[in-house]
């Protein structure tokens, strides 16, 4: 499992990081 990273440079595996609606930049959920 790769970490998702937000637009602010924070990474994690929860929706806070993985959801595009929350500003995800990399390894986001969906395609």
Swiss-Prot record:
InterPro entries: Chitin-bd_1 (IPR001002), Endochitinase-like_sf (IPR036861). Signal peptide: none annotated. It comes from the Eukaryota. Residues 1-30 form the Chitin-binding type-1 domain. One of its GO terms (biological process) is defense response to fungus. Has potential use as a flocculating agent in water treatment processes. It holds the Pfam family Chitin_bind_1. Keywords: Antimicrobial, Chitin-binding, Disulfide bond, Fungicide. PROSITE patterns: CHIT_BIND_I_2 (PS50941). Disulfide bonds join 4-18, 24-28. Seeds (at protein level). SMART domains: ChtBD1. GO terms for molecular function: chitin binding. Gene3D superfamilies: Endochitinase-like. Chitin-binding protein which functions in defense against chitin-containing fungal pathogens. This is Morintide mO3. It comes from Moringa oleifera. The lineage of its organism: Eukaryota, Viridiplantae, Streptophyta, Embryophyta, Tracheophyta.
């Amino acid at each position: 499992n790769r970490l998702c990273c937000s637009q602010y440079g924070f990474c994690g595996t929860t929706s806070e990081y993985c959801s595009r609606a929350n500003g995800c930049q990399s390894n986001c959920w969906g395609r």
